[in-house]
């Protein structure tokens, strides 16, 4: 699904990647590991079209990523989970979930039922749809973010230190939920320092700080 060929990325005088070659196949969960500064987040950002690269290429489904329109990519192909989630704090849970339903032709009642069903799936049946996101705990907010992904149903999921601010038990629960989203047509790439998380991936990619 994603092919990275001879990728080079620099920040000023510092080289992050030099002639990097990687393949990521659909149907798998990959974990990016390595010390701070090795380029895990930078690599995710480049795959997400949030960070340019200097040389080389990234192909997504056989197409040059640079030639794919960002609006189409974000709307139809990608969900990117940051440490601070992909939610709007001052909006309600319902309003955030609406962003995962863009393009779905549902009447008001069906839309509400769909949101309630997906919240139940991620263990948040007790959450009110009109509750503001900033009122939620970190674990609850992560679950809402995953609920939004379930609604959007993207072929590519990127996650950057998804559970870094959570306790071990909640981290495992969030990872378990993320793994339920795995299917043969979806690629999931997770950047993490947590051995408990990366040991559950299908494949581990170890990045090193360039000399």
What is the role of each PLM region?
Residues 109-127:
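Conserved ABC ATPase "signature" region
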Residues 56-64:
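Conserved ABC transporter NBD signature motif
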